[in-house]
């Protein structure tokens, strides 16, 4: 009999040794379910305390953890004060050595893309990459022949949230202030300044 209890399947909580109460013979009037009598309430033990949150939950992939940790070069001895400025510049270069990814959206395109601005050396390379990325929407061979890539203006949102035309400021300043790129129809960008082809 003891062997059967070890493999018995029941609906009770694990670790409880209570016997299941037999169902009542007559259901109480006005209730949807028949409940066991009041004496059975004394047999119920208090519920176990809620478990603490598991360490490491929710899971974060290792590459995300390494991206969040700053990458700096550490030295054992303190550098002289004259080299402090050069070291801070080197730390900024190391910290900025990763990519500078921004979202790119296009009017009429059903999806967004992300690009790394540090890959491009100037506005021309950036515009060519954007045209290749959104080829089917900006007048590629598969799109309508009436659509011309020059009908679109490339704009960006800077740190202040202002919408500016790409090409109005030097490229290095553009890279440092750009938060988001948007390819909009030229007719909508007329108020921003002269469109560039």
From Swiss-Prot:
Induction entry: By auxin.
Region (Disordered): 1-43, 66-90
UniProt KW keywords: Auxin signaling pathway, Nucleus, Repressor, Transcription, Transcription regulation
GO cellular component: nucleus
Expression (tissue specificity): Highly expressed in etiolated seedlings. Expressed in roots.
SUPFAM superfamilies referenced in this protein's UniProt entry, alphabetically: CAD & PB1 domains
UniProt main location, coarse: nucleus
Described purpose of this protein according to its UniProt entry: Aux/IAA proteins are short-lived transcriptional factors that function as repressors of early auxin response genes at low auxin concentrations.
Subunit architecture: Homodimers and heterodimers.
Protein known as: Auxin-responsive protein IAA31
Name of the coding gene: IAA31
